[in-house]
Amino acid sequence: MGYFYLTAETWTLLVAFVTLLLIYAYWPYGTFKRLGISGPKPVPFFGTMLHYRRGFFTFDEECKKKYGKVWGIYDGRQPVLCVTDPEIIKAVLVKECLSFFTNRRNFHLNGPLYDALSVAEDDQWKRIRSVLSPSFTSGRLKEMFEIMKNHSANLIRSMKKKADKDEPLDLKEFFGSYSMDVVTSTAFSVDIDSLNNPSDPFVTNIKKMLKFDFLNPLFLAVAFFPFLGPILEKFELSFFPKSVTDFFYASLEKIKSNREASQQKSRVDFLQLMIDSQKNSGAQQDKSLTDHEILSQSMIFIFAGYETSSSSLTFLAYNLATNPEVMKKLQEEIDATFPNKAPVHYQPLMEMEYLDCVINESLRLFPIAARLERVAKAAVEINGIVIPKDMVVMIPTWPLHRDPEIWPEPEAFKPERFSKKNKDNIDPYIYMPFGSGPRNCIGMRFALVLIKLAVVEILQQYSFSVCKETEVPFEMDIQGLLAPKRPIQLKLVPRS
């Protein structure tokens, strides 16, 4: 019994510790009860995160059905107000966007990406966004278009090798390499040709970066004990593998140094615009980027450009293969716009109405941003709901895009929903594949041009077809980004 003997002081300390631990564990979970907002019951430390084991999009959909347009969840100890009411969404993303809300929450585990546009807040965010915005104007996209066409031609040639052998294509592999080649070429004037070099370190490293798990021990540690975030940040711990961020920052630093040392007139690309902001601002530091900010924006552009475009193209190809009547109608528009497989030009491509409908419908089913987040900088009341300071407001686009009260037959692929006749009836705060408001996806138009060019040039020559390797319907991955659990495989059938 001696092993179990404790002094009165020790027992007092033990009881005090357990009491404090229980208070700490349960303390935040009365937030939504006090606000009069319903939601799933949290468990100590985890909050409602254990539901993510079935997929966060499934969880969001179930909550919307059960609790209506507003509910509360807990990511660990962090209260998260979930909103699908269009009026509240408009206030959060647009009306009060800059005055009462800042960017998504910061877990302090960003590594060297601490000053990327997706993490920056308030004045820093405004400064970076203002420098980057000119990269994505229609004029810039037209300049980039011929460069994109070089890589779309490489994509067709690579796909042809599989088509000639009647072999299925792993779509993400092809579209990922195409996206990477377009991004690095248009952003940095560097041709890595990952379509022909799939083991290129740019591609292998970006794949490592995309492996994110909501139940990652580092993520859970910060979710359970938020005060650890800034401490772990001091030790330079990050969600992203250090070897990956080191590789990209070293590569981008070399590209930047070579650009600055070169006397030749370089292409006016994403990198050059950022470098020019330093040269042209003089003493006006509020109109330029630091050296590190330039590298961070370059890194996030590679990451976002690769993942969003390649995933959207993959889902689009699947939707066309499983809806051949839609694909046939799209091919008819392509043939009418570019007769006899004529070269694709920017302006007519941008004016293709049915192509827009098809892409919009695919993005409805598989939005690039399945969740949008903002954090309250100060307490604010919107539509009778009090949002306290530091509250995370989350807008789940997945259930919004699949709400049967808004979209009849929500699981069906019906591009006509976005026809001229119907699109004016679509609430812009219901359909938000790229987000909305001042903080929407800055590369939205770039991604759409990249997607349109690839799908039109492929469908000029081929049709997508399901095969025995195609999983219909496919199973969604439950971790991290919106993606299929297993690679989507299709065949290309030459058009007669």
From Swiss-Prot:
Xref: InterPro entries: Cyt_P450, Cyt_P450_CS, Cyt_P450_E_CYP3A, Cyt_P450_E_grp-II, Cyt_P450_sf, Cytochrome_P450_3A
Matches recorded under PROSITE patterns: CYTOCHROME_P450
GO-annotated molecular function: heme binding; iron ion binding; oxidoreductase activity, acting on paired donors, with incorporation or reduction of molecular oxygen, reduced flavin or flavoprotein as one donor, and incorporation of one atom of oxygen; steroid hydroxylase activity
Function: Putative steroid 6-beta-hydroxylase.
Reaction it catalyzes: an organic molecule + reduced [NADPH--hemoprotein reductase] + O2 = an alcohol + oxidized [NADPH--hemoprotein reductase] + H2O + H(+)
EC number(s) from the headed UniProt entry: 1.14.14.1
Similarity comment: family membership: Belongs to the cytochrome P450 family.
Keywords of this entry: Endoplasmic reticulum, Heme, Iron, Membrane, Metal-binding, Microsome, Monooxygenase, Oxidoreductase
Residues involved in heme binding: C441
Main location: endoplasmic reticulum
Keyword Membrane in annotation: yes
Tissue: Highly expressed in liver and intestine. Moderate expression in gill and spleen. Low expression in kidney, brain and heart.
Cellular location(s): Endoplasmic reticulum membrane; Microsome membrane
GO cellular component, one term: endoplasmic reticulum membrane
Domain of life: Eukaryota
Cofactor dependence: heme
Mode of membrane association: Peripheral membrane protein
Protein name: Cytochrome P450 3A56
